[in-house]
A protein has these predicted regions:
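Extracellular, repeat-based ectodomains that mediate carbohydrate processing or recognition
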Residues: 1-342, 457
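Extended, charged catalytic domains and RNA/DNA-binding interfaces, predominantly
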Residues: 270-277, 291-640
């Protein structure tokens, strides 16, 4: 670890599982790759730090026997010491951060999920293993920690989340950043002169405005919820990134690098230190020198090309920070108990079917424009969204591509969180194709799917859902935009697909089992009834599903749910139910619906010799039912 040595540390999926790997470049010559984590753990989230000229420590989160734990391993000279578990046996631990100071002060922090909350904890590694100390409040959702060890002291920063309501059925999260300093009496939060511990409110470009009138926002291709700490001769800085324009384009993003100095352990007013790019990162070491510091940020160009720039930022050259107050949101605790419903079941012949609730079109931060850690949103879906089934369908290519690493990592978390008969997180992704509306245009023309979208192209997306064994990611631009090649691979892997959005072209393939009628973005069947009824009138036999399509951290609470009747909560039973259309779509309410024709359950095909059909409906709403409408071939024929 002298000036001639460079170590690169990463996580990788290997045949035996996920491992932490490392490779040394000595005097410009790359050495052999070494495995740092053991085979008994599925290891992710690596970080590393140079402790001295001859010592390096690596930390990661490892899964063993359904538990995520933080482990470290140190390299002393040329000898690797045995791995050591640092987190306790309570909860599941993620995202380690390390900080070392030449005086020997060596700390490790991480976030940990237990009792339905994330919290940030840490321990001193200077002389063995010090006691684990609470850093963030225990009754809030606190995660994504970072750590800085300076002459002014040891500081930790983190993201804090509060569930909020913006009106009936409108659920989101309120994001704030916080900083704490280690003192002789433990960890103490830094405040401003008025005693306010909120260092930053992350509202602009992240959460919709509710009052005085609703103003939505869109995606962003940077790290708008990640705190960064920067050392200064006078104190430290807390930095974060925000979307410059609340309503700005996802495809042409612009971001601000915002900073708030901490002087004499007090928060100073925020300022804007850089503008015009996205995905800001601090160079190592994160240190101001002569009033300047180095950062890295990117531009995003059509076709998914990112170009990163080295920025020399000056803390004395800044512009005022301005941000409107976000009114209309109020705190809540999820799940809202009075909104939960008892498990319903129905009898069909000799079989009993349970009613399970699914959101099968969700996103996390593995999608280029979305928010939320994969582990965090699986917990959210299970514990706050009260889902039985969730599928995170990250886009194969939306502005920038989904890498193979990101796809495999998403599937890893799906399998890590699945507990048959308790909770299912199924692997999959979103086929994000756009096809031309001009007959003479080629399917494979990149202009179909790159901004500003040529050939009057329109979305032809699919939710691709695999069984737990998974399947390949077939990126539409790599197969000439040919959905037949997608269908072939999905069928071979035992998966299914569902249409998405209010524009698509049905493929007619057996793996395409359902249509997304509504989502958090709108009621598609109401917007374009001719599309959906036209498919049915032409003999299409597709299930009705509703999926949140949440890019904003709320799986299960994004305005759309699918009720599925299955014999048990297993992947096999759920996929079979979808193939047989034993399901129904709602706008997010958990209404109980049992519809039958001549005694046959919804989704079944029946024949009748006389042409007479007896329809029965049993329904229980979460609110009093106002109206029921019978529709035949796209026309309303009866209202009850």
């Amino acid at each position: 670890m002298n000036e001639k040595d460079l170590w690169v540390i990463w996580s990788a999926k290997r045949p035996e599982g996920w491992r932490i790997l490392g490779r040394l470049c000595r005097s410009g010559v790359w050495q052999k790759t070494v495995a740092i984590s053991g085979k008994q753990y599925q290891a992710i989230h690596p970080t590393a730090i140079r402790v001295s000229e001859h010592v390096m420590t690596v930390a990661w989160s490892g899964l063993q026997q359904s538990r995520f734990r933080i482990q470290t391993r140190s390299l002393q000279g040329i000898r690797w010491l045995p791995p050591r578990t640092e987190s306790d046996t309570e909860g599941n631990a993620f995202r380690p951060a390390l900080a070392f100071k030449p005086d020997g002060n060596f700390w490790l922090v991480w976030d940990q999920y237990e009792q339905n909350h994330y919290r940030v904890v840490g321990r001193n590694l200077s002389a063995g293993q010090g006691p684990i100390e609470a850093i963030s409040p225990t009754d809030m959702h606190c995660l994504q920690p970072t750590l800085l060890n300076t002459d002014q002291g040891l500081y930790a920063a983190w993201l804090q989340k509060q569930d909020v309501l913006g009106g009936p059925g409108v659920v989101s999260q309120w994001h704030t950043l916080h900083v704490a300093k280690r003192t002789d009496d433990g960890w103490r939060q830094i405040t401003d002169a008025a005693g306010n511990p909120v260092a930053a409110e992350l509202t602009q470009g992240l959460v919709a405005q509710i009052e005085p009138q609703p103003v939505a926002t869109s995606g962003y291709l940077g790290r708008r919820t990640t705190p960064m700490l920067l050392a200064d001769e006078k104190g430290i800085w807390l930095l974060w990134e925000r979307k410059s324009d609340h309503r700005g384009s996802t495809a042409q993003p612009r971001g601000d690098l915002v900073g708030r100095q901490i002087l004499q352990d007090q928060l100073q007013p925020a300022v804007v230190l850089a503008q015009g790019k996205v995905d800001y990162h601090l160079a190592h070491p994160a240190q101001v020198s002569g009033g300047k510091f180095v950062a890295l940020a990117s531009n995003v160009y059509p076709g998914g090309r990112r170009l990163y720039h080295r920025l020399l930022c000056d803390v004395n050259q800044h512009t005022p920070f301005q941000q409107a107050d976000w009114q209309g949101w109020r705190p809540t605790e999820l799940p809202i108990q009075e909104e939960l419903t008892e498990r319903q079941q129905i009898q069909v012949g000799e079989k009993t079917y349970q009613l399970y609730w699914a959101d099968m079109h969700c996103h996390n931060n593995l999608s280029s424009d979305a928010e939320g850690e994969p582990d965090e949103l699986n917990y959210y879906a299970r514990d706050r969204g009260a889902l039985d089934v969730v599928v995170f369908t990250n886009n194969d290519f939306y502005i920038v591509p989904l890498t193979q690493y990101e796809y495999e990592l998403g599937n890893f978390f799906a399998n890590a969180f699945t507990r048959p008969k308790q909770f299912l997180s199924l692997p999959g992704y979103e086929w994000t194709s756009r096809i031309p509306g001009v007959k003479t245009a080629r399917l494979s023309d990149p202009g179909n799917w790159t901004h500003p979208y040529n050939n009057r192209s329109y979305p032809n997306h699919r939710s691709v859902i695999y069984p737990p064994a998974g399947g390949p990611v077939i990126r539409f631009m790599e197969v000439e935009n040919d959905i037949n090649r997608l269908n072939y691979e999905v069928e071979k892997a035992g998966g299914i697909t569902l249409t998405q959005h209010p524009a698509f072209k049905p493929s007619g393939h057996p793996v395409e089992v359902g249509m997304e009628l509504t989502s958090g973005w709108g009621n598609y069947m109401q917007q374009v009834p001719q599309l959906f009824h036209g498919i049915l009138n032409q003999g299409g036999r597709l299930a009705f599903v509703a999926c949140g399509d949440s890019h904003r951290r709320a799986p299960g609470l994004s305005g759309a749910l699918t009720g599925i009747y299955a014999e048990e909560l297993t992947a096999e039973s759920i996929l079979e139910a979808l193939r047989k259309r034993r399901c129904f779509a709602t706008n997010g309410s958990r209404v109980f619906v049992d519809t039958r024709a001549n005694g046959s359950l919804m989704g079944e095909a029946i024949t009748t010799e006389t042409g007479d059909v007896e329809l029965t409906l049993q329904a229980t709403g979460t609110r009093p039912i106002v109206r029921t409408t019978l529709i035949h071939n796209g026309k309303q024929i009866k209202t009850f």
